[in-house]
Amino acid sequence: MRHTIAVISSKSLAHNVARIRSIAGESKIIAVIKANAYGHGMIGIATELTKLGIGVFGVAYADEGIILRENGFTQKIIVLVPETNGNAKLCVDYDLTPVIYSFEFAEALSREATAKGSLAKGHLFIDTGMNREGLSPAMALDFMEKAESLKNLEIEGICTHFATSTNNLTFANKQLDLFNQTLDLLNDNGYDFKYKHAANSGAIINLPESRFNLVRPGMTLYGYPPSADLEEVLNLKPILKLKTKVISVRRIFAGDTVGYGLEYISDKERSIATIPVGYGDGYSRGLTHKAQCLIGGKRYSFVGTICMDVAMIDIGDDEIKCGDEVVLIGWQGDEFISAYELSDKLGTIPYEVITAISARVPRIYVD
């Protein structure tokens, strides 16, 4: 087994699901496990969520849903990114529920379901202001009227997506108002939906009116609030610890260089520890000279350029030996390195930091 592993706490995952349920009330959870469950391992996380009674999964693409089906998961699977006509057959064959905003795709679903003698299901995706994907609210009624002619297709749900559910709530409320107006228009014309969903992680907290009967938590499942100011309210527990072991310790002297490009020149005698983790594992090269790690509950800084497979740490004169545990994300003793800490150093968001952890890092599920 590799020394570099991601340890996933099922106990912390259960805590986070319980917290989301307590806030969401009667709304059921669509557990968003796209992008390899935000880097946590889709099959492992889906297995743990099944134990917790989660009945709906959200994925980005049909191929993610197919992987779940081929691994025996029977939950409803909603494909959250609109698919092309060519993937309509996959959605029907694997009983996936895609979002729909193209009538041509709706026709393709109908054809495939009719040919198979089954019923295809979809959720109408309304664009309320993000301008990324979705159907214009002005076209929603016309779409539903035309869709009545399509055999073996049930538009069982309707949804939208917020652009600013953590910061600009004025805009988010405008989106919610537009979504509600669209719902009212469709309802007045005889169209109701079994499932309605809009609330992502931020909206579950900040826009309780947007919860409807389904909510879509993503990063909150994995222990990180959508913004730092919601940390206390949510009281989540990060479920991932990224850790490795020291594989080499060497003594260097004043004037010695470390790593590619001779970018680090030591100003005195010190010890350097090498660990088997690098940007090939998803630990960004952009963290060079910026990030720290934990050894024995103490913070140490990286020196030299972070390589594809290894990185180097200034351990000074401390007694550190090969085999000692090194934590890159998570707790060790009383110290904690969060994905937020690393994302701040990279000028990005914690979603990217965690999702970037590559497939060659084994995910180990504990508790």
Task: Identify the meaning behind each predicted range.
Residues 2-14, 63-64, 83, 90, ...:
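Active-site anion/phosphate-binding pocket segments in diverse small-molecule metabolic enzymes
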Residues 4-15, 22-197, 211:
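Active-site-proximal beta-alpha core segment in soluble small-molecule metabolic enzymes
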